[in-house]
Each structure stands twice: as C-alpha cells, then as structure tokens.
Amino acid sequence: MDKTINWTGQRLTLRIEKVAHGGIFVARHEGRVVFVSHVLPGELVKAVVFEDRGGSFCRAEPIEIIEASEDRVPHFWKEAGTDGPQRALGVGGAGGAEFGHIKLERQRQLKADVIEEALQRMAGVELRPVVEPVPGDDEANGLGYRTRVQLHVDEAGEPGPYRERSHDVVPVKHLPLAVDEVNDLALHLKNWQDVKKIEVAVSNTGQVHYSVDKKPKQEGKLVERAAGRTFRISSGGFWQVHKGAADVLTKTVNEMVAVVGIDVDAPNLDLYGGVGLFAGALAAKFANRLRITTVESVKQATEDAKLNLADLPAVRAVCAPTERFAAEQASAVAAGEADYSRATVVVDPPRAGVGARVVGDLLTMAPLHIVYVACDPVALARDLKGLLAGGYQIKALKAFDLFPHTHHVETIVSLVRNSK
C-alpha cells in the first residue's frame, strides 16, 4: 500500500460493513479500510476523511446518511449528536455518548459482536456472549446512570466535556447520562474562569462530592454500599461509574466462584483490588474467615481497603503493583516456598489488561480458579490466549452493558485449571 496516499478532506460514498473495537465502524473504498464514526452496519453514507496517515486505512466522519438503518434513532443528547450543521461539517459532538444514535438493544448486539470477534481472532475461542443490561436501564433508556463525571472548562469559564477527538470544550447545561444529583449541582450556572477541570462523585448513600482542579470541596470519604457491605473511598479514588455496577459485578464474581467452589484456607487473591470490593464481597459471601489478600498499587486505595476490610480477620490489604507481587509469588512457587494450587484469584486490571508478564506469573502460580473482570475485550482476548495455552479452560463468560450509549462493555470470565 502506498504510504504517501492521503485522502484527507475527500468525500466518499461508503457502505458500512460492521462494527470495530473502539466504537467505530468499518467500510472499504478502493482497497482501503475506512473507519467511520456515528454510523451503523448496512447504512449507505457520504463521509469526509478527517485523518489519513497513508497505509491501509483512514478515518472519516459521516456528513450525510443516504440509507439509514432501522436501528438508528435520534440522538438523546443534542450536544453529542452529529445532526444539523455539525454533520455537514463532519465534526463530532461532545464525547462520551458515541452510541447514542443506536437503539439500546442493538448497541448490546454490537458490543457482543466486538467481544465475539476479539475472542475468535486473538484467542481462537468460538463464543458469542449475550450482553446483559443492568436492572433498570431499559426502563430509563440507558440514561441517568453515571455517578462519576469529569468536566473541563473553556476560556469563557463554561464547563462541559471535550469534543470527540479534541480538547475543545463543549459547554453543556445538562448531562443526560449522569445521575440526578450531578445535574442538580447546576454547574453551568457558575463561571469557572481559571479552572481547568471539575470532577463530581455521587455515592449510593446520598453523598455528593466534587473537586476543582484536584482540590476536594468536601471533607471525608465517600460511603458506598455494595454486596451488603459498606465501602469508604477517599477523594479521587476509584469506584465503578454505573450506579448499579458494583452489585452486578460482585454478584457475578461470587456466583462464578460458588460454581467452582473456594477453599477458605487457600492463599486466595484479589489482584488490582482497589478499595477491597471483590475481597470484601467474597469474604461476606463464603465465610468471614475466608483467607484472601487484596493487592493494589495506589497507597490511598490500599489504606481505604484496610479500613473497609478491618472486620475480616483473615483478609489483608497489600500495597504493591500487581506485576511485582505476582512475580514475587511466582518465584516463591518455583522455589517451593508457596503453593497456590488450591487458590482462587480474582483479577480486575485496568483497560490494558494484565499483560504477558502477569499471565506468565499466573501460569507459574497455577491457581485452581481465575476470575477475570475486564473492561476491554481486546486486552481480555489477548490475555486469554496465554492463559488458555497455559492450561486453563473457560468455565463461564458473562458480559454487561455498564456504559449504555458508549462502546464500552464489561466482561467477566471464569477460568479453571485443566486436570493434570
């Protein structure tokens, strides 16, 4: 392919073929792949190329929908849609709602397509999941679920999200994906001159905290309830974005563990453990004497985990990068100084996945059961390839739509070690 080719600015008529990872869609023109946003499979569109670095593909934005899919709906959020003048210019709207032009049921089918293709292409697994909604989301049309929001501020002091593919701020008066408590703050009524970023967090116990340029405006920790337990989170600490996510995820992990069984005396692990959500939920479900270590690299989150798990005598929280901790444990196993053969290990890594090093260390540790909680299907499939080749098999896989109207999807996989 000619590396010097450049279609930037050209207008192309394209038939959209399928969805791709990252919330974009695939078309082809003159032997090249064209990645197009804000469209649907089967649609015929006119699109303008906004990025072309040569090679086998370029990126485009639709400027006219010639033949629309029956799954297309008016975007629920005017500032994020591409209707009207923005479409004619090929300019995206506010980020964070890139699937807002698609019926909810079809969004989930597209997310299942992405998971299915990633598993097949990268892990050699033929499996199509059903992407399940969080209870209540269908009734709310997938709106009003975000409990964590980040807004940026433009030169005029008006807050809003970034425009897609840019650092231009789109001023907004309402955030349809956010819970009511966020919108009740009416942040748009205040001038935020000289401020760069506003972050808002709402707990399911009714607290509303926000920070301005990383400086908290309230004292104390946020208090969340999940899996029948109380969790305290320091300002800026991680908690699931969807108001129902923590309960859905802990319930699913606990169910997967129950099917396989858990040895309460084994050296069980909760890797990338955050504030202790999965460790606490497992201990509460299976026995308060469950032995489990939660491992987290962020010091403040580890301190929160110690507080949250203080009533569980056999649970400990360790502050360490999972990569270092896993390497140390793998070395101990290789030296005959540790035994994880009866253990259950929960991993909930960031978007990049656990990576080849941790996969290798897990294979050396050889726990009986691994439960992998993933927010990126491609990273998950890459890691599964190594785990499956190393002697594990998929016992169960479930997927959840924790981010309606976006391309993001959560997948949980139960892996058991093959009998030797």
Regions found by a protein language model. Give the residues of each.
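Accessory RNA-recognition modules of RNA-modification enzymes
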Residues: 1-347, 352-360, 366
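C-terminal catalytic and target-recognition region of SAM-dependent MTase-like enzymes
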Residues: 178, 322-332, 338-339, 355, ...
